[in-house]
Amino acid sequence: MSVATHTPPAAPKEEYFKYTNLGPLLFGLVGAGLISLMICLMGAFVFGLKQFLFSWLFGFIYFFTMTVGSLFWVMLHYAVDAEWSVVVRRLLETVAGMFKYIWVFFLPILIWAPHIYNWMNIAPGVDPVLDSKRALLTPWFWMLRAAIYFAFFFTASYLYKRFSTEQDHTGDPGCTTRCRKLSFGGIPLFAICTTFAGVDWLMSINYHWYSTMWGVYIFAGSAWS
């Protein structure tokens, strides 16, 4: 009695991004990025550090929401076992994989945070509104939460891409099962991290203002982006 074996077909090479395939385009992209960065730094001297940091924060949030939105759709598609999404899932996984780089662009915000978030410069006992929020709005705790957000987003995006590409080579259906389990536990954590990131990085700019829907707005906006 023979045992039939099945070897999954190799995924096309286009499925895997290699920067070496870009050729001269790579140098053009790197050059354009460096020139853009130099222009941004020049803006800090022309318009002042504070204006530069607010503009940097705007740009960071723009790309952050696109990246986190891609991760959301990957998680949702696995959670509901959506078969049709396989044609776009690799693209979403690749965009979500940018979390291994995007944290670098948060460093200027982290380093010069007191220039953006005025509450970091106010001593306890000066503003009763701020004192009532000190449990959340303390510099060290704010930075710790940022590290937790990036750690979760990076880990989740890495695991999805790892299991997905592993399934390309092995054909193991268990990879899909692991991704589904990851989604069931990860979606609540995703909602919490995305909501509090929006509160920490945007709403706390004006700590007197509050909104029960701001986190939902950021969450939904990320998915839409």
PLM regions and their residue ranges:
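Transmembrane-helix bundle segments that line or gate the permeation/cavity pathway
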Residues: 2, 61-169, 186
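Long, contiguous internal "core" modules enriched in hydrophobic/ aromatic residues
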Residues: 20-36, 40-41, 139-225
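Alpha-helical transmembrane segments and their helix-start/interface "positive-inside/aromatic belt" motifs
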Residues: 15-30, 53-58, 86-104, 142, ...
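Short, charged cytosolic
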Residues: 1-8
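Membrane-interface interhelical loops and short amphipathic "cap" helices
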Residues: 10-19, 39-61, 82-90, 117-140, ...
